[in-house]
Amino acid sequence: MTEKVKKLSPRRRARECAVQTLYSWAISKNAPEEIELNFIVDQDNEMKGVDMPYFRKLFRQTVDHVEIVDSIMAPYLDRDNVELDPIECAILRLAVYELKFELDVPYKVVINEAIEVAKVFGAEESHKYINGVLDKIAPALSRK
């Protein structure tokens, strides 16, 4: 019996790449332009099927708005931002950016995508934590 392989949408792939670059940026503290370029070069073969303009927008705009994003997240976290698992922080930052600034993307899509990305990159229970936090943030941003 063959296992059915689900093809990921270009936007899902863009979100996955944005989370990876946000993680690298947070860990390394290198310039965002350097992180993005190195990621694209390193992942050359993996970049097929990625909505590149959306990936670049998500990464760059999340970095540009990180103070706003972090201030939105802070009241809904059970610990300080710096104590979050770095990958969870990257997923939350991306999702909060989308909830706040990408108003053409339905909030349910943003939350679902964050959960799915957490299942790929996060710890075993990360997706539940991500869901709980975003479920509280969305109404606060008038997205529910």
From Swiss-Prot:
Keywords per UniProt: RNA-binding, Transcription, Transcription antitermination, Transcription regulation
Record has Transcription regulation as a keyword: yes
Pfam families named in the record: NusB
Disulfide bonds: none
Gene Ontology MF annotations: RNA binding
GO cellular component, one term: cytosol
Lineage top rank: taxon: Bacteria
BP term (GO), one: transcription antitermination
InterPro entries, per the entry: NusB-like_sf (IPR035926), NusB_fam (IPR011605), NusB_RsmB_TIM44 (IPR006027)
Cross-referenced CDD domains: Terminator_NusB
Physiological role: Involved in transcription antitermination. Required for transcription of ribosomal RNA (rRNA) genes. Binds specifically to the boxA antiterminator sequence of the ribosomal RNA (rrn) operons.
Similarity remark: Belongs to the NusB family.
Protein name, as recorded: Transcription antitermination protein NusB
The organism of origin for this protein: Histophilus somni (strain 129Pt)
